[in-house]
Design a protein with these regions (language model features):
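Short, solvent-exposed loop/beta-turn-alpha elements that line the ligand-binding surface or hinge
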Residues: 112-126, 195, 212-232, 278-280, ...
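Hinge/lid segment of periplasmic solute-binding proteins
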Residues: 96-150, 175, 285-288, 367-372, ...
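C-terminal lobe and pocket-closing loops
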Residues: 100, 275-282, 293-300, 304-399
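Periplasmic solute-binding protein
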Residues: 102-106, 127-169, 194-219, 298-307, ...
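Extracytoplasmic/periplasmic substrate-binding proteins
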Residues: 39, 99, 203-204, 235-323
Length: 427
């Protein structure tokens, strides 16, 4: 407890009247202070977070929130450093992948997170968003989703329509459209797609693999890269890459090709939408999901997690603050820090007037609702049923999938050999 020294209440008689300091002293001593670490360092975003914190503290005068804003590029390293020194913040914004790392090291209070999700209404979240933050055994959660993004195939509705094509519904449709629009002599391509040796290539390829029933792990957590279903998917991806730009394509090349009209289709995340809006082309963009045996959307979520080992007051305060941020009206404010790019993970948010009437969201018509509902179709490597294997994070970090994609697309190497090597290097 802090000692409050009251100097202004000293009277000439030498008596100390404590009345003027008692109220403030009592309030401060009863407050529980917790830290909230997040990556919203930009002034506009920080203003939104400040407002949310102020609203919470007004409703909960016995809890004080101390913010710890950290640049996204340094965020995970900062958490590791704080964890080693035993100084983890009580509440943290985390990606689904890093939440797995933290959970593996027993840094997350799963029960506290579970309490928040139950209080917020488990059924209010899109199933895919919930699955991404399930614990490895599928029985609990490692973060409460607050926003996310999904990836699929974006297409120019006008160009496809003029060429006699409707929205691509399966692999064959995608291939036919890509073939039609490719004119390499004039540097026109059918689809802008990831081929670089990196995470984006793994993410893009995963949609085709999972839509064909191929996963990197089975329900026992065993590696299943070198399989017939995976071979079919990678062979298709290799074939499709004939109709993309030459070389190793990553984020910048793909976005630029779609935005400047070099390609009428692109595999990209929802973070392409703000640029489409700024270009005044909101009504002309469509969204398709790679489909073969099944639909498969790649998606990711940002969540709020609660650190383990807290005392009872800290834990209660952390749960209360996380539950507050998980209320639809507050999730709406969080998502609208990046309208179009960040997507709601709670079904109630898309029904709020503030979300629907946002200038950017409104410009896309029914598309935002269609995209948000795509969270129900989210599938990712390592998520098998309700099991969310933490070892998938290590496999992604190793780069074996992205390397295989790059080998067969840019390097035109043999699919069978690339998968065999990936399987061998993963075990």
């Amino acid at each position: 407890m802090k000692k409050i020294i009251v100097t202004t209440c000293l009277l000439a008689t030498g008596f100390l009247l404590t009345a003027c300091g008692e109220s403030q002293s009592s309030n401060e001593s009863q407050q529980t202070t917790i830290q909230f670490m997040h990556s919203s360092v930009e002034q506009e975003r920080l203003s939104v977070i400040n407002e949310l914190v102020a609203d919470f503290e007004k409703e909960n005068p016995d809890i004080k929130i101390k913010q710890v804003p950290v640049e996204e590029s340094a965020f995970n390293t900062k958490i590791v450093t704080l964890a080693r020194s035993g100084k983890l913040p009580e509440v943290m914004e985390v990606s689904q992948d890093f939440a797995k790392v933290m959970d593996k090291d027993e840094l997350i209070d799963q029960m506290a997170v579970q309490n928040v999700i139950e209080e917020s209404g488990e059924d209010n979240y899109y199933d895919g968003a919930k699955n991404l933050v399930r614990s490895e055994d599928g029985k609990s959660y490692i973060a409460a989703p607050i926003s996310g993004w999904v990836q699929g195939i974006w297409y120019d509705k006008e160009k496809l329509s003029e060429a006699g094509f409707s929205e691509p519904e399966n692999w064959d449709d995608i291939l036919k459209i890509a073939q039609h629009f490719t004119d390499k002599e004039n540097k026109q391509y059918g689809i802008a797609m990831p081929t670089a040796e990196g995470t984006m290539s793994e993410q893009a390829f995963s949609q085709f693999a999972l839509s064909n029933g191929a996963n990197v792990l089975d329900d026992e957590g065993e590696v299943t890269i070198d399989t017939e279903k995976m071979r079919e998917a990678l062979s298709f991806y290799q074939n499709l890459s004939q109709y993309t730009m030459p070389g190793s394509n990553d984020v910048t090349e793909i976005k630029d090709a779609f935005m400047n009209g070099t390609a009428p289709m692109a595999i990209y995340s929802t973070y392409i939408l703000p640029s489409v809006y700024e270009a005044g082309n909101s009504e002309n963009i469509g969204f398709a999901i790679p489909t073969q045996k099944d639909q498969a959307v790649y998606g990711t979520v940002s969540g709020l997690t609660i650190s383990s080992g807290l005392d009872e007051k800290q834990k209660e305060a952390a749960e209360a603050f996380t539950a507050f941020l998980s209320q639809p009206k507050n999730m709406e404010k969080w998502v609208l820090m990046s309208p179009g790019g960040a997507q709601p993970v709670n079904k109630q948010v898309v029904e709020l007037d503030g979300y629907k009437e946002n200038e950017v969201i409104k410009s896309f018509g029914e598309l935002p609702s269609e995209i948000a509902s795509a969270f129900d179709e989210v599938q990712v490597f390592g998520l098998v049923g309700e099991k969310n294997f933490t070892k998938m994070g290590d496999i992604t970090s190793s780069g074996v999938i992205g390397k295989a994609v790059n080998q067969v697309t840019v390097g035109n190497e043999d699919v069978d050999q690339s998968l065999a090597d990936a399987q061998k290097n993963t075990k």
